[in-house]
UniProtKB/Swiss-Prot annotation:
The gene is kynU. Homodimer. Pyridoxal 5'-phosphate binds at residues 97-98, 129-132, 172, 201, 204, 226, 256, 282. It comes from Burkholderia mallei (strain ATCC 23344). GO terms for cellular component: cytoplasm. Its cofactor is pyridoxal 5'-phosphate. This is Kynureninase.
């Protein structure tokens, strides 16, 4: 892709192009931040009005039954399941990634303590998203025996970090900064052969790249719905537990929604035999309902078509940045190899924050991550090839003119 006309031609031939019309994208904006917050499905506003106006406003408490609110976490989990290689009754939409990580990690450590008490080490990456590490640190601080969080600095170091004391490997499939993607089947096999349990974080994978959790024989996973799945800001996350583990994994947040019969109101907790045991308290129905609007769009295509376009978009973006912005202090930190790349492209720049603010001011929305990382997410359901061209041209002009040096672009916002 060497001209804007070529980009437009690619858009005309794109089989996913019609899906863009199902998103409410503002005019004059090139949105390359779907890896942080997905765009709004057009159906979401009407769905919100339906839930608030009719189901809540008119149905009131009856809607737990008549509108299917009570079954929503499991029903939507079943709809999400094919996107991550899961089966029915293995996924629940609920809580946040942080809370679901706590549940699963605690359940896995408890399981190992019963069957292999010597195993007390959690292995993860130093570059993992901080909440994963914070949750592990907080959980370790609460346990009454010596546990250890062992961090590796390179994916190649994982085999050497695993030993007969390893309980769980907690790895994020696609790195949030760089977009590096692990080989899920290979990593899972390595971890399981070492006698440890494999816990995946799919925050930057679900809806972005094909995932096959059951095919990889993973032991558990968490993910969010507000990024590539377009569930809306703060939409609930998901938890996956394969059927072979569900009865054996006992999560610590034994709230009433995880009981086998919540409305029996029994004084003693008896966990649900299926994935519902990983629920805790009353669910956020309004925000959860929005998740279905994003899943409705995914039902019109498949992850292989999405992946093909994702790679084409990121290939084009990287090539254009390196040709059109040649001579600028930009360093690609995202892998070039397709099998190691998620659905983003990240570049390091000495003044990355200021450059990104200048881009946003001109309607090209990506985001910034420390240290010095310009991060661009590509969501094939609505990102066009002409967006790639126009975004790079805007970046080139900002760098050539040093427009990023304007004082207002150095002011740090609370969210970057």
């Amino acid at each position: 892709m060497k001209t804007r006309e070529e980009a437009l031609a690619l858009d005309r031939d794109d089989p996913l192009a019609p899906l863009r019309e199902q998103f409410a994208l503002p005019a004059g904006v090139i949105y390359l931040d779907g890896n942080s917050l997905g765009a709004q499905p057009r159906a979401a506003a009407a769905r919100a009005q339906q839930v608030i106006g009719a189901e809540w406003g008119e149905g009131l408490i009856r809607s737990w039954n008549t509108a299917g609110w009570f079954a929503l976490p499991r029903r939507l989990g079943d709809r999400l399941a094919p996107l991550i290689g899961a089966a029915d009754d293995e996924v629940a939409i609920t809580d946040t990634i942080s809370i679901n990580l706590f549940k699963l990690l605690a359940a896995m450590l408890r399981h190992q303590a019963r069957h292999a008490p010597k195993r007390r080490v959690i292995v993860s990456e130093r570059s993992n998203f901080p909440t994963d590490l914070y949750i592990a640190q907080g959980l370790i601080a609460q346990l009454d025996r010596d546990y250890e969080l062992r961090l590796i600095d390179d994916p190649a170091d994982l085999p050497d970090a695993l030993d007969d004391e390893t309980a769980v490997a907690m790895i994020t499939h696609v790195n949030y900064r760089t977009g590096y993607m692990h080989d899920m089947p290979s990593v899972t096999q390595t971890v399981r052969q070492a006698g440890a349990l494999m816990l995946w974080d799919l925050a930057h994978s679900a809806g972005a790249v094909p995932v096959d959790l059951n095919g990889a024989l993973a032991d558990g996973a968490v993910g969010c719905t507000y990024k590539y799945l377009n569930g809306g800001p703060g939409s609930p996350a998901f938890v996956w537990v394969p059927k072979r583990h569900q009865r054996a994994f006992e999560q610590p947040l034994s709230g009433w929604w995880g009981h086998r019969a919540p409305f029996a109101m029994q004084p003693a907790f008896e966990p649900d035999p299926g994935i519902a045991r990983f629920l805790c308290g009353t669910q956020p129905i309004v925000s959860m309902s929005m998740v279905e609007c994003g899943l409705d769009v995914f039902a019109q295509t498949d992850m292989h078509a999405i992946r093909r376009k994702s790679l084409a978009l990121t290939d084009a973006f990287v090539a254009l940045v390196e040709s059109r912005c040649a001579g600028q202090p930009l360093k690609l930190v995202t892998p070039r190899a397709h099998h190691q790349r998620g659905s983003q492209a990240s570049f390091e720049h000495p003044h990355g924050y200021e450059v990104m603010q200048a881009l946003i001011a001109r309607g090209v929305i990506g985001d910034y991550r420390e240290p010095r990382i310009l991060r661009f997410g590509f969501t094939p359901l609505y990102t066009r090839f002409v967006d790639v061209w126009d975004a790079v041209e805007t970046l080139r002009d900002i760098l050539d003119t040093e427009a990023w040096r304007a004082p207002e672009f150095a002011t740090r916002a609370a969210v970057t």
